[in-house]
From Swiss-Prot:
<dbReference type="InterPro" id="IPR015797">
    <property type="entry name" value="NUDIX_hydrolase-like_dom_sf"/>
</dbReference>
<keyword id="KW-0460">Magnesium</keyword>
<dbReference type="InterPro" id="IPR000086">
    <property type="entry name" value="NUDIX_hydrolase_dom"/>
</dbReference>
<feature type="short sequence motif" description="Nudix box">
    <location>
        <begin position="72"/>
        <end position="94"/>
    </location>
</feature>
<dbReference type="InterPro" id="IPR023735">
    <property type="entry name" value="Nudix_NudL"/>
</dbReference>
<dbReference type="GO" id="GO:0030145">
    <property type="term" value="F:manganese ion binding"/>
</dbReference>
<dbReference type="InterPro" id="IPR000059">
    <property type="entry name" value="NUDIX_hydrolase_NudL_CS"/>
</dbReference>
<dbReference type="GO" id="GO:0000287">
    <property type="term" value="F:magnesium ion binding"/>
</dbReference>
<feature type="domain" description="Nudix hydrolase">
    <location>
        <begin position="34"/>
        <end position="165"/>
    </location>
</feature>
<comment type="function">
    <text>Probably mediates the hydrolysis of some nucleoside diphosphate derivatives.</text>
</comment>
<dbReference type="InterPro" id="IPR045121">
    <property type="entry name" value="CoAse"/>
</dbReference>
<protein>
    <recommendedName>
        <fullName>Uncharacterized Nudix hydrolase NudL</fullName>
        <ecNumber>3.6.1.-</ecNumber>
    </recommendedName>
</protein>
<keyword id="KW-0479">Metal-binding</keyword>
<keyword id="KW-0378">Hydrolase</keyword>
<dbReference type="Pfam" id="PF00293">
    <property type="entry name" value="NUDIX"/>
</dbReference>
<feature type="binding site">
    <location>
        <position position="88"/>
    </location>
    <ligand>
        <name>Mg(2+)</name>
    </ligand>
</feature>
<feature type="binding site">
    <location>
        <position position="92"/>
    </location>
    <ligand>
        <name>Mg(2+)</name>
    </ligand>
</feature>
Length: 195
């Protein structure tokens, strides 16, 4: 672990890193879903650490206008899902892959669009200028890490779709509505570090 990440962001980020590393995720349950994707959970190392999130462009075919982490489908040339997440983050929000300090990954989650999505947790220095790829990203925003990890901010709705019951998580931050897979990923991270 580079001292720059800890010293720039203080004790609270060090505590998060320690808890994350001490409580590694349990292996996910088997899924017959053979389509793989990965997202980067970018933790920006500010004096008060933040999560960087995107609002997807309104013209996209899937998940248009939704809040999401940068990420996408694994390409055949990707050597790992970590590489997938880093490649997508560079394409979508201009985070150089070389600038990300990967802490680890969470267990995969199944998406409503048929992908098994693996969240990759990474630290990003605060001196990077983030800008969204206009074709994919309508906007960027940050939420304080410890606000995002407060479990009491997440609500759920049980829905019946396609003959199957699903629990959908949702939350708000200022004017941003965070729901679905993105809310489920943040909630899972919060459960793992138990802050």
């Amino acid at each position: 672990m580079s001292d720059q990440f800890v010293s720039q962001s203080g004790r609270t980020l060090s505590e998060f890193i320690s808890r994350f590393q001490l409580q590694q995720p349990q292996p996910g349950s088997f899924s017959a879903n053979s389509h793989h994707a990965a997202v980067l959970i970018p933790i920006v190392c500010r004096p008060e650490p933040t999560l960087l999130l995107t609002r997807r462009s309104d013209h996209l075919r899937k998940h248009a206008g939704q809040v999401a982490f940068p990420g996408g489908k694994a390409d055949p040339q990707d050597s790992s899902l970590i590489e997938t997440a880093l490649r997508e983050a560079e394409e979508e929000v201009a985070i150089p892959a070389s600038a990300v300090h990967v802490l680890g990954q969470l267990a995969p989650l199944d998406s409503s669009s048929g992908f098994q999505v693996t969240p990759i947790v990474g630290l990003v220095p605060d001196n990077i200028t983030f800008h969204g790829n206009e074709e994919e990203v309508a906007g960027l925003f940050e939420i304080p890490l410890y606000e995002a990890l407060r479990l009491s901010r997440y609500y759920w709705l049980d829905i019946h779709r396609g003959g199957v019951n699903h629990r959908v998580y949702l939350s708000w931050y200022e004017s941003q509505f965070i729901w679905g897979l993105t809310a489920a990923i943040i909630r899972r991270l919060a459960q793992q570090v138990n802050i």
